[in-house]
Amino acid sequence: MKGFVGDIEKLTEDNDDFRRVLYTGHSLQLVLMAIPPGEEIGEEVHDDRDQFFRIEGGKGEVWIDGVCTTVKADDGIIVPQGARHNVVSTGSEPLRLYTIYGPPEHIDGTVHATSAEASAAHEHFDGKTTE
């Protein structure tokens, strides 16, 4: 199959991994995330890529350049390149979301079960796509 077709809402809601790369193209990448209550992705800046988040479940806060916004299911967020940002899970259930990087950020097929595992990994997109 070319491209990616799937029930992204169900896939996101069923995902228990902190990070799971679903599809990597030349210019964008689709990643599922489940952030446990009280945890966060960690403050970061992408100098060379934009990032889109779609919240499918849970509650949280998104910080973009020092501005905090409360988020919940059905919210969408765009973080422009160069913006310092963080996503924090503030509810009693995991914050479940998918994110789209443009261009890709992670190695295709990456799965990190926990945030600790993700923090320990230092690999970045190596140019290899899903197809």
Task: Give the positions of each predicted feature.
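Structural motif
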Residues: 52, 59-61, 68, 84, ...
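Short acidic-glycine-tyrosine-enriched beta hairpin
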Residues: 67-81
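Short, conserved beta-strand element in jelly-roll/cupin
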Residues: 34-36, 45-62, 100
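Short, charged/polar surface micro-motifs in flexible loops or helix N-caps
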Residues: 26-28, 36-40, 59-61, 68, ...
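Ligand-binding loop in jelly-roll beta-barrel domains
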Residues: 81-107
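A short, N-terminal "cap"/entry segment at the start of jelly-roll beta-barrel domains
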Residues: 1-29, 42, 112-131
